[in-house]
Amino acid sequence: MSEFTNVTIIREANVYFDGGVVSRTVVFPDGTKKTLGIMQPGEYTFTTGAPEIMEILSGELDLKLPGSDAWNRVGGGESFDVPANSSFTMKVLSLTDYCCSFLG
């Protein structure tokens, strides 16, 4: 889906890691939420409450998911699932555009 209709956009930005990651929250009529954001090159560790699906729209990063010691390359057009109540680390290699869907 490249376009969202009939949604509410939260005006205030979500700013993490001194501006290295910035997103906006999109709220759908059924109450579900997504964030649309940009990540600058760098290393970032996030924690989750609800399970998430991260879609990488463009850019490239190396990803370490919970319970794994391996780094996996993820690029534009790919996605990955993050379990609830966990943390994951990304080494962002180039400017990365993403969409994060919150499932819980």
Swiss-Prot record:
InterPro entries: Ppnp (IPR009664), RmlC-like_jellyroll (IPR014710), RmlC_Cupin_sf (IPR011051)
Keyword Magnesium: no
Substrates-to-products reaction catalysed: a purine D-ribonucleoside + phosphate = a purine nucleobase + alpha-D-ribose 1-phosphate; adenosine + phosphate = alpha-D-ribose 1-phosphate + adenine; cytidine + phosphate = cytosine + alpha-D-ribose 1-phosphate; guanosine + phosphate = alpha-D-ribose 1-phosphate + guanine
EC number: 2.4.2.1, 2.4.2.2
Pfam family, one: Ppnp
Keyword Hydrolase among UniProt keywords: no
Keywords attached to this entry: Glycosyltransferase, Transferase
CC terms in the record's Gene Ontology section: cytosol
Free-text function comment from the UniProt entry: Catalyzes the phosphorolysis of diverse nucleosides, yielding D-ribose 1-phosphate and the respective free bases. Can use uridine, adenosine, guanosine, cytidine, thymidine, inosine and xanthosine as substrates. Also catalyzes the reverse reactions.
HAMAP family for the chain: Nucleos_phosphorylase_PpnP (MF_01537)
Protein name: Pyrimidine/purine nucleoside phosphorylase
Source species: Geobacter sulfurreducens (strain ATCC 51573 / DSM 12127 / PCA)
